[in-house]
C-alpha cells in the first residue's frame, strides 16, 4: 500500500498532488477522483480540471472538455513536464480554506470561503486583485451550517494523523452539494494565510514567532563521518569477510 511506502514529508516537500490524493483515498477521506495523464489520446466526456502534478498557486490549472486540448497543453507547456493530473469538474462547488498550526498546541483558524470571479479559484483571484491573497475577496468566517463546519474540522484532525505536519499551513477543501472533499495541502511560504487567524487574536508576528520557536525546539540530528573513508570496505577481500 502507498501509505507504507511513501513518507508524508515527500508528499509535502514535492507538492505532489497525486501522492497526496492517493494517501487521502487510501485512508478513507473523501477526494475527487484524479487520474495521471500523458501525451496519449484521451477520451474525455464532460468538463475536467487539468493540473500540473507538482506545484501550487493555481498555476497551470485549466478547465478542459476535450482530449485534444489536454494533449496540446501538456505537450507544449513546461508546467506539465513533470506530470499532470485531471479530475472531474464540480460545477458550482465552493472553495473552503482553513489554517492549521502545530505549536505550541494544535489549533485551527476560522474557515474562509474565497469569493472567486471565474469558474475556478484562479491565480488572478488569489494574487493579482486587491493587493494579493490577503486582500482578495472572501467570506471570513465562512457562513456554513454547523454540520459542514464540524465535518471539516473532523477531516482536518484525521489528515493530521496521516500527515503530521509542523508549523503553519493551510488545507483547501471543496464543498459540492453538501459533500465535502479534501483538495490539497499548502505548506509553502505565502500559503500560510496568516490573515485566517486575525479574528482569533493571533497577530502575524505571534504566529511567525511560534514557527521559529517550534523550529528551535526540534531535535537536531547529528551525523557522523565515521566509516565514510571506505577503509573497512577496501580491506575486505570478499563478501564473506564483509558480513563477518
Per-segment meaning from a language model:
Residues 13-93, 153:
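Active-site nucleotide/adenylate-binding loops and adjacent lid/helix of ATP-dependent enzymes
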Amino acid at each position: 500500500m502507498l501509505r507504507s511506502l511513501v513518507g508524508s514529508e515527500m508528499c509535502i516537500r514535492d507538492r505532489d498532488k497525486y501522492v497526496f490524493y492517493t494517501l487521502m483515498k487510501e485512508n478513507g477521506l473523501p477526494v475527487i477522483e484524479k487520474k495521471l495523464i500523458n501525451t496519449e489520446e484521451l477520451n474525455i466526456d464532460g468538463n475536467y480540471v487539468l493540473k500540473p502534478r507538482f506545484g501550487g498557486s493555481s498555476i497551470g490549472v485549466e478547465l478542459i472538455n476535450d482530449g485534444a486540448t489536454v494533449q496540446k497543453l501538456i505537450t507544449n507547456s513546461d508546467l506539465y513536464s513533470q506530470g499532470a493530473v485531471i479530475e472531474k469538474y464540480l460545477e458550482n462547488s465552493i472553495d473552503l480554506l482553513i489554517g492549521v498550526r502545530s505549536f505550541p498546541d494544535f489549533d485551527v483558524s476560522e474557515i474562509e470561503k474565497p469569493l472567486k470571479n471565474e469558474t475556478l479559484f484562479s491565480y488572478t483571484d488569489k494574487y493579482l486583485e486587491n493587493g494579493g491573497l490577503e486582500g482578495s475577496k472572501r467570506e471570513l468566517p465562512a457562513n456554513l451550517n454547523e454540520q459542514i463546519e464540524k465535518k471539516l474540522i473532523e477531516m482536518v484532525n484525521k489528515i493530521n494523523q496521516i500527515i503530521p505536519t509542523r508549523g503553519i499551513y493551510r488545507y483547501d477543501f471543496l464543498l459540492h452539494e453538501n459533500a465535502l472533499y479534501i483538495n490539497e495541502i499548502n505548506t509553502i511560504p505565502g500559503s500560510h494565510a496568516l490573515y485566517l487567524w486575525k479574528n482569533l487574536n493571533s497577530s502575524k508576528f505571534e504566529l511567525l514567532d511560534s514557527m521559529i520557536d517550534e523550529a528551535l525546539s526540534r531535535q537536531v540530528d547529528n551525523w557522523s563521518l565515521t566509516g565514510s573513508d571506505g577503509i573497512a570496505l577496501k580491506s575486505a577481500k570478499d563478501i564473506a569477510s564483509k558480513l563477518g
